[in-house]
Structures are given as C-alpha cells and as structure tokens.
C-alpha cells in the first residue's frame, strides 16, 4: 500500500488555493490538483507492506500526543524546480510545527525501518512545507506569482493511502491524529501533576 502522512486544509484556505488555480486553468499543459485532494505532505512512505500499517498508526498517535496545535501561514506560490522547466506549481506554507511533525515522523520511521528507510523515494530530499496546486503534463508557461498572507490553525494530521488510477490518485484517510501536546503540558505543570480534564 502506498502511504503518506499529511495535513489537510480548512475550507477558507482551500478556497483561496482553488481561486489561485484559475491562473493555470487556461493552459492545458497544467493539471490542477482537485480541491478535495489539496494537502501538505509531512512524510511520504511509498509502497509499504500492509503488515507495517499498525506501526505507522502507532507512530502517528504517539507523535500527536507530544505535539501541540499550532498556527500556520500560507505565503505565495513557487515552482519545483525553481530554475529551468517547472514540473510542479505550489503554495508555500510556514510553521515550526510542520518541521517538528516532519522531523518526528522521519525519526520514528527510521527507528522502525533502520537502513531500509533510505530506500523510500525522496528520503534524501530536505523537507519544504508546501501544497501542490498543479502539475505540468505538457508544455505550458509559468504564471505570475500569487500572494496569500493567510493563517490557519493546524490541529491534526492524517495517515493517507494513495491508489494510483488512470484518472489520477485516489486518497483514503486511514486515520486522523489530533494534536494534544501532552508532553509540553506535562513539562509546564511539573512532575506528578496531571493535565486538567484527563
């Protein structure tokens, strides 16, 4: 099964991204990502045996207990690669929380898989939080940058299965993980104290 961890977006952010996609719709070479599939990938796992699924679910729950909700910012658009012929048009996202989640997931997967983790496609690439807006399928021009300046609360992430179909990938959310930040609360309360409401 083809798996990845991702953050999905609230309606107001998704609406702004869909509006930005109108910039590339006149050009048939660009294929916009369907609105319901817009997301920020935290870690791509590639094709994994189904028997490993419980480990990835447990990792998500463990990290969600440690990390607190945070606010993220949507900046402007960019291209991968930045020079030469672009393949991907994306929106840049910013938040230390994205980096913490990505690093925590990566460390957990390394612990689970050991040296095998380096065989995951893209494992050696640095994490750059972004939301893919469109992919270039044929010759098409670059479009002027779009600036957003939006903020939104990130309260969780998900483990997602991706099935590749002739018309494009189909995503299925296998599990959602709500950020609870228990580790940070325990540190603030001191030893022996229990969080309120637990």
Curated annotation (Swiss-Prot):
Instruction: Place the motif HXTX 2 on the sequence.
Output: 130-133
Question: Which catalysed reactions does the entry list for this protein?
Answer: a 3'-end 2',3'-cyclophospho-ribonucleotide-RNA + H2O = a 3'-end 2'-phospho-ribonucleotide-RNA + H(+)
Alphabetical list of InterPro entries matching this protein: Cyclic_Pdiesterase (IPR009097), Phosphoesterase_HXTX (IPR014051), RNA_CPDase (IPR004175)
Q: What GO annotations for molecular function exist for this entry?
A: 2',3'-cyclic-nucleotide 3'-phosphodiesterase activity; RNA 2',3'-cyclic 3'-phosphodiesterase activity
The residues annotated as the active site are 39, 130
Keywords of this protein's UniProt record, alphabetized? Answer: Hydrolase
EC assignment: the record states: 3.1.4.58
PANTHER family per UniProt: RNA 2',3'-CYCLIC PHOSPHODIESTERASE
- Briefly state the protein's biological role: Hydrolyzes RNA 2',3'-cyclic phosphodiester to an RNA 2'-phosphomonoester.
Homology family: Belongs to the 2H phosphoesterase superfamily. ThpR family.
NCBIfam families, alphabetized: 2_5_ligase (TIGR02258)
Q: What is this protein called?
A: RNA 2',3'-cyclic phosphodiesterase
Q: Provide the species name.
A: Thermus thermophilus (strain ATCC 27634 / DSM 579 / HB8)
């Amino acid at each position: 099964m083809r798996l990845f961890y991702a953050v999905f977006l609230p309606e107001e952010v998704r609406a702004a991204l869909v509006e930005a996609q109108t910039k590339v719709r006149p050009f048939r070479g660009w294929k916009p990502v369907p609105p319901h599939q817009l997301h920020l990938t935290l870690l791509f796992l590639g094709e994994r045996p189904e028997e490993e699924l419980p480990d990835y679910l447990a990792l998500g729950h463990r990290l969600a207990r440690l990390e607190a909700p945070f606010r993220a910012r949507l900046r402007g658009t960019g291209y991968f690669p930045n020079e030469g012929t672009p393949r991907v048009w994306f929106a840049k996202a910013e938040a230390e929380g994205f980096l913490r989640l990505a690093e925590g997931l990566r460390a957990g997967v390394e612990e689970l898989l050991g040296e095998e983790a380096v065989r995951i496609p893209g494992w050696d690439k640095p994490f750059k939080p972004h939301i893919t807006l469109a992919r270039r399928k044929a010759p098409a021009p670059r479009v002027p940058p779009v600036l957003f300046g939006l903020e939104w609360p990130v309260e969780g992430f998900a483990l997602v299965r991706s099935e590749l179909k002739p018309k494009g990938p189909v995503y299925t959310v296998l599990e959602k993980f709500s950020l609870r930040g228990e580790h940070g609360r325990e540190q603030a309360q001191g030893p022996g104290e229990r969080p309120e409401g637990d």
